[in-house]
């Protein structure tokens, strides 16, 4: 409904074909439109594809409850933003698959996994490029706005120019993408 893992793999292949070396993935786990514990399979497949291609690392992972809010619950969105931009979270695990399994062991399903830092070098920073391949605008607007809108005021954050590409129009007011 929101995206497909084959699109991620095609983007990773494109990055490899273009010789990109610093490719980081910020994984948003679903748990609503698919099984609430299917995230471990997607994360496993992604880690395997990174190894196979020799490109890409999972920098962060989190449930859609944080990254894909649509009701201006800025505390949730800020937690996602802080993980992706500042590399800050109460949860750090360099092994993405283990991070998901740890959440399951604690009774937390994909949708509600709090942001986890898997690779602190993968933060989004000045002049980075971001490809957001979510196809449902309603769940993508808020996190997008935090990254591209200089007038965003939902919480205090550092604004910096990011080249941001998305796969559909999220909002006519988001003129920076």
Show where each model-derived region lies:
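Short loop/turn segments at secondary-structure transitions that flank enzyme active sites
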Residues: 31, 138-139, 170-171
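Active-site histidine-anchored catalytic micro-motif
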Residues: 1-45
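Structural beta-sheet core signal
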Residues: 25-27, 132, 164-166
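Glycine-rich, histidine-containing beta strand-loop boundary motifs that form or position
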Residues: 27-29, 62, 168
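Long, well-ordered, tryptophan-enriched scaffold segments
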Residues: 34-126, 131-132, 137-161
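Conserved small/polar residues in nucleotide/adenosyl-binding loops
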Residues: 175-177
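S-adenosyl-L-methionine-dependent methyltransferase catalytic core, i.e., the SAM/SAH-binding region
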Residues: 152-155, 163-167, 171-173
């Amino acid at each position: 409904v929101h995206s497909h893992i084959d699109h991620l793999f095609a983007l990773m292949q494109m990055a490899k074909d273009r010789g990109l070396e610093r490719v980081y993935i910020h994984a948003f786990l679903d748990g609503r439109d698919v099984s609430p514990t299917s995230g471990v399979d997607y994360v496993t497949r992604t880690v395997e594809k990174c190894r196979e291609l020799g490109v890409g690392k999972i920098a962060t992972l989190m449930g859609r409850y944080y990254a894909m809010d649509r009701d201006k619950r800025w505390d949730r969105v800020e937690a996602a933003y802080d993980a992706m931009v500042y590399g800050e979270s109460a949860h750090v695990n360099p092994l993405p698959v283990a991070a998901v399994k740890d959440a399951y062991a604690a009774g937390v399903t994909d949708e509600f996994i709090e942001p986890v830092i898997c690779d602190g070098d993968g933060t989004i920073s000045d002049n980075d490029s971001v490809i957001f391949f979510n196809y449902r605008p309603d769940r993508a607007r808020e996190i997008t706005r935090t990254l591209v809108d200089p007038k965003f005021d939902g919480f205090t954050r550092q604004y910096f120019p990011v080249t941001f590409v998305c796969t559909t129009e999220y909002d006519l007011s988001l003129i920076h993408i």
